[in-house]
Amino acid sequence: MKALLYAGHELLTTDDVADALLDYVEVLPLNQPPERVVIPALRDGLPVTAEVVLTAATPVAVTTTSIRDTHLEGDIYAVEVLRRKAERVAGIGYEPRM
């Protein structure tokens, strides 16, 4: 699991979701309006649905944790959506990290 630091809060999410979110933020153009994305996460050990608003200038940090990566309901779908969004805005030449 990775810790997502956003707007003063820490959320735990799967490694794949965290990586896909960072990949998406990385390719966002500066002139694109804010976009809300939904990801599965853990907060205080309980599953939650997190909604974050992203722009190219959004300060987002991701750190590794000692918590074993586990399945969260909707994590595969969230990764697919984030990857599609990244491909859409990045255009030709986008290669997601795997």
Outline where the language-model segments fall.
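Signal for well-folded cores of large energy- and translation-related assemblies
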Residues: 26-29, 87
